[in-house]
UniProtKB/Swiss-Prot annotation:
This is Multidrug export protein EmrA. The chain crosses the membrane at residues 25-45. Residues 46-390 are periplasmic. Homodimer and homotrimer. Part of the tripartite efflux system EmrAB-TolC, which is composed of an inner membrane transporter, EmrB, a periplasmic membrane fusion protein, EmrA, and an outer membrane component, TolC. The complex forms a large protein conduit and can translocate molecules across both the inner and outer membranes. Interacts with EmrB. EmrAB complex forms a dimer in vitro. Belongs to the membrane fusion protein (MFP) (TC 8.A.1) family. Pfam families: CusB_dom_1, HlyD_D23. PANTHER family: MEMBRANE FUSION SUBUNIT OF EMRAB-TOLC MULTIDRUG EFFLUX PUMP, MULTIDRUG EXPORT PROTEIN EMRA-RELATED.
Amino acid sequence: MSANAETQTPQQPVKKSGKRKRLLLLLTLLFIIIAVAIGIYWFLVLRHFEETDDAYVAGNQIQIMSQVSGSVTKVWADNTDFVKEGDVLVTLDPTDARQAFEKAKTALASSVRQTHQLMINSKQLQANIEVQKIALAKAQSDYNRRVPLGNANLIGREELQHARDAVTSAQAQLDVAIQQYNANQAMILGTKLEDQPAVQQAATEVRNAWLALERTRIISPMTGYVSRRAVQPGAQISPTTPLMAVVPATNMWVDANFKETQIANMRIGQPVTITTDIYGDDVKYTGKVVGLDMGTGSAFSLLPAQNATGNWIKVVQRLPVRIELDQKQLEQYPLRIGLSTLVSVNTTNRDGQVLANKVRSTPVAVSTAREISLAPVNKLIDDIVKANAG
């Protein structure tokens, strides 16, 4: 039995060595299959996606400033407050504006009365011309009757001279009356009272004063959230003083900074998937490429890089790509300006344009909150004109 055992002992390592070779072969084949599968997956799928985490949420920041100078009496909104379009944000002291408005109304009433008097004078001066014409005709008639009598020596020369002087005087008075009438007409230009230049100018001053009074109430031009409030009650502000900012929660987008080696296949309209740090992988935003910027970030910086130097080092540049977000998703999962995102662009479809070639036909944004209707002040002006026109 010992002899049989001695002859079988060397066969065990041979069997183990064969198993090890087969295992290594299987692992090698498995790795090759996985590598090929990954290669195929990259060729068919992954190579059509460009990804970057150098991407941040951007949005509109509406800087609130006053349109008139004044002293702040009330501040109606603070940081993080929600405001609607047309809500009052800041109130200025209206005393000076109200005084200017009252002064403008008084000036309009005075201008209407003066202009109305000029129009009345025009009728009086026209009547005076008729009177002077009659006087001239009478003087001329008297003189004509006396000429034959003077030639026949039936009246004295002095009386004839007096008649001649009366004609000259009447003619001079008629000329003066005509000049006065023309001068008065030049003042009123033969137009209606409300269309007179002096009245129009005074009415414009009333409108300006009324607008200044209305603008002591600083309102929000858009619906959004208040940020960066700097104004305080009692502060003296001017039209260039930043008061606060209003940030709309809608119409946000992502500025993704892709390397210049990633943008060759990017086109306008390509679909984008966005993941944010604030919500993580639980929320996937969908969007699309709406445009590629016309310059890299360094090219538009305050101090552009100077590459014409001896120690130049090449650095891969990044180009901002603007990505539009789904507004419904924004309403459900609101974002904030400056948040970090991970962006993946599907570049499979390359039928779109690299650069936009259509002119925008609609406004990017519209706000009518600060448009002030002049109907109330125009009615007030009409009432003042009627009340002082006599």
